[in-house]
């Protein structure tokens, strides 16, 4: 059984590693796309929207609903990518906790 001091050292080490992984993730860009890639939403790994791009074909004043739907698809796609990357990157720490 580990003594308390070793457990604290291991926990601090894991915390630093986790903070680095979080910083790496925040510095990564994720681009979600709608059907036919007509709308692209780009986020940072900490879920900050940095850009939305609309291809000309999707901009129709007579059909705003399609633009809204495609924008929602692109945003949700990017957020799903971020969630998956977060689980992959930080999920490994759950099993390493010393307690």
From Swiss-Prot:
GO molecular function: DNA binding
This protein's record includes keyword Membrane: no
The protein's assembly and partners: Homodimer.
GO cellular component entries: bacterial nucleoid; cytosol
Protein name (record): Nucleoid-associated protein SZO_16661
Family: Belongs to the YbaB/EbfC family.
Chief location of this protein within or outside the cell: cytoplasm
Keyword Glycosyltransferase included in the entry's annotation: no
Keywords: Cytoplasm, DNA-binding
Subcellular locations according to the entry: Cytoplasm, Nucleoid
InterPro entries given in the database record: YbaB-like_sf (IPR036894), YbaB/EbfC (IPR004401)
Biological role: Binds to DNA and alters its conformation. May be involved in regulation of gene expression, nucleoid organization and DNA protection.
